[in-house]
Every structure is written in C-alpha cells, then in structure tokens.
C-alpha cells in the first residue's frame, strides 16, 4: 500500500509542466526586453527634452543676433554722419547720407519682417492705433486719422507698437 501511496503522491512527468515553464521563461525574457526598451526610450526622451530646453534657451538668448548685426551697420553709418562737420557747402551731401541711412534702416526692418502699418487717412482701429486726441475737420472723414505722432508697426502679423494718432471728428 505504501507503494500505491508513493505512486499517487509523486506526479508523473507532465508535458504541460515543461511547456508552462518554457512559456513563463519566454514571458519573463519578453518582459525584461520591454523593460529595457522602456528605460532606453525614457532616457532618450529625457535627452530630447534637455536638448529642446537648451535650444530654446539659446534661441531666446541669441535669436536676435542677426538683427543686431544688421543694426550695427546702420549704427556705424550714423556714427560716420555724426562725425562730419556740417557746413553750408556740404549740407546737401550730409542730408543725402542721412536719408540713405534712414532708408537702409527701414529696409533692414522690412527684411526682418517689421512692417510699418499705414496710418494717415486710414480709419481708426483701436487694435492698431492709440488715439491721443480728436480734431474737428472737414478735410478728413470722421473716425479717420488726421495726424500721426508715432507710426504703428507689426512684426509678421502681430502689432508690436500701436500708432499714436489724432482722429478726425465732424466740425461743430
């Protein structure tokens, strides 16, 4: 009877047990691979974030470098103009040089997408203009700009400086 109990207690080799163990081993290896892949991608993403922050910081710090370099050329021209002793004989040449430098500055601003917004005679627009006062006149339609103290400018499509203007109103 003891032999019967021994044979009943000891399980005969079951082919399913080997398959299950093999399947468990495969799943553990696959889980380890997924974990390693995850850790690698996480580290790669952290590096990406760090680089993106660094690039953004450098862009913020040095983004205007090209504009500044171009502006320095204009500053040099104004410095040369200011060093000239202006007399009646050279006034026209001096004025022409200053006009050319002013045109160079306007051209530079346009190259950098800083655009003057036409104001004189245009309808008043509070998103573009700041009304300093109003003036009674029959020379301009009411609500239109009679005088401009500061021209409005935009960078791309954003107003970066509203114009300071005087708005026409009906004479009384």
UniProtKB/Swiss-Prot annotation:
GO terms for molecular function: adenyl-nucleotide exchange factor activity; protein homodimerization activity; protein-folding chaperone binding; unfolded protein binding. One of its GO terms (cellular component) is cytoplasm. Residues 1-11 have a biased composition (Low complexity). The gene is grpE. Participates actively in the response to hyperosmotic and heat shock by preventing the aggregation of stress-denatured proteins, in association with DnaK and GrpE. It is the nucleotide exchange factor for DnaK and may function as a thermosensor. Unfolded proteins bind initially to DnaJ; upon interaction with the DnaJ-bound protein, DnaK hydrolyzes its bound ATP, resulting in the formation of a stable complex. GrpE releases ADP from DnaK; ATP binding to DnaK triggers the release of the substrate protein, thus completing the reaction cycle. Its main location: cytoplasm. Homodimer. This is Protein GrpE. It comes from the Bacteria. Belongs to the GrpE family. It is found in: Cytoplasm. Pfam families: GrpE (PF01025). Residues 1-22 are annotated as: Disordered. GO terms for biological process: protein folding. Keywords: Chaperone, Cytoplasm, Stress response.
